[in-house]
Amino acid sequence: MNVQKSNNAEETITPFSEESSLLNSNSYIPATFVDPTTIPQTSTEDIDIHGFNSIFDIPNLAWIEVSLLLNVFLAGFDGTVTASAYTTIGEEFHAANLASWITTSYLITSTTFQPLYGSFSDVLGRRVCLFMASGLFCLGCLWCYFSSGMVSLIFARSFMGIGGGGLITLSTIINSDIIPTRNRGLFQAFQNLLLGFGAICGASFGGVLSEVFSWRLCFLVQVPFSVLSIAVGFFFVKNQSGYSRFHHYCVLFKKIDILGGLLLVSGLTSLLLVLTFGSSRSIQTYRPSQLLLLLGILCIVAFVYVESITEAAPIIPLKLLKGLYSSLVLTTGFLIGLAGYAYLFTLPLFFQLVLGDSPSKAGLRLALPSLSTPIGGLICGILMHRNFRVGKLLFSGVFLMSLGYFLSLFIHPGISPIVLGIFLIPANVGQGIGFPSSLFSFIFAFPQNSHATSTSTLYLIRSIGSLFGVGGLSAVIQLTLRKKMLADLTKFTDLDSKSIQKIIHDVSKSISALYELPEAIQEIVLSDYTFSIRKAQQFTTICCVLALGLCILKDTIKPRTPSGFRY
């Protein structure tokens, strides 16, 4: 591949030394333009800086990978097990309107801490951070198991997310430390397979465990795997070369953007609380919603300001956001992250309410689409290895996601199980293609020495999209349901205003309250619930279609570079 230096501002970004070693071992390479539409080929003359000529020369590699891949499996398992079980949990605690926070609270902390683990591991060492992430995740699982109420469970999930944010990140970082560059793609493929396998297991067993035994087992079963990962890692995972433990505490606060992390957590939490309280439309929550909205905006503005002046490794390097191309790819990542999680967490509710599935059956229905995601990732990897253009892969992935979400609008109680299974496949295959191709579309627009920071930036933006996918869609369903029930139930002359408000309150708190209503009213409320879920599905489809439009726009506005390549 021909490469040249360019005067374009996006091509000469100064690397952040605190993070350049995390995901990229070649941070010493001079900043040169990389064609973002093709995959750069590794030259046979490339020198690996790890000191190993073969993966078979790495001491205790098998045991190290056992520890790391167990964490990756747990990350995939936890991501879908709550999707299968959150309706059951909401029922038990009579807080169905807060059930989305079981996932949202986890995503807030994991999203924020995920990029921080890179700096933490540089300063404190890989071992300490690996034990910290796995230990906090394990303790969070135990806290979830013993939670006595929804509020306690939400706090437990937040605590669990602090550790969860490092499970995949540290696995990638440690592999980058020890695996020769030419073999790293193979080990990344192992991670993707374990992540997909974990997601399949979580989707398949989450509903079964919550229905047959208890939803608490969904968290308890993760503890032995986490303990095993910690035990194996204790004996075999070592700190990175060049690490010194004698001065790390004095530079801890200089290298890690702790203030930025706190502002981001506060801002995201406030904005998501606005969605939760705002969906109730009650007088008691109206003023707090305004205050939370103001607080959220102020925290986000302050976060952006801190990122622009911090001397630490920023959570979001603002230099990477310059340029229309970068903005379009990041917005695409945000939208497909939002749509992907919204789709995943809407389906179990739809299956149980509209199709009449039990929690276990609804969970098993998610197994097939969960299997489709790693297949999509495998297809993406094969095509990228054959130099298939990344821009076309991104368009294809988002197109399949849009098609799948559109097909989900036609799922109805009388649909054939085979047809239903076919309808569920495209969205997840598209996600398996779209997620990695959006990452490479972004990072290959920058020089090699900026790939680490651009990777963490894209992951963070997509995770924020996932946050609003779960929290936002829950708010859409609750708000639409309340409005529709109020309009339809007022047509009953036998119901006064107080009775209507009680029905609305009970149904929003517990889905089982719906089946305790008189048959005529039950039919109306069930129809309203279906209507609300359909609105959420339509919103998800629109978001994905917008992302598809941005993919087209990205390919039409990308500037031509001096090397002759196009972004």
Curated annotation (Swiss-Prot):
Localization per record: Membrane
Record's keyword annotation contains Phosphoprotein: no
Transmembrane residue ranges: 136-156, 159-179, 193-213, 217-237, 258-278, 291-311, 334-354, 364-384, 393-415, 426-446, 457-477, 536-553
Domain of life, source organism: Eukaryota
Keywords: Membrane, Transmembrane, Transmembrane helix, Transport
Gene Ontology molecular-function annotations: basic amino acid transmembrane transporter activity; L-amino acid transmembrane transporter activity
Family matches, as InterPro entries: MFS, MFS_dom, MFS_trans_sf
UniProt topology in membrane: Multi-pass membrane protein
A Pfam entry, by short name: MFS_1
GO cellular component: fungal-type vacuole membrane
GO biological process, one term: L-valine transmembrane import into vacuole
Family: Belongs to the major facilitator superfamily.
Protein name per its UniProtKB record: Uncharacterized transporter C460.03
Origin species: Schizosaccharomyces pombe (strain 972 / ATCC 24843)
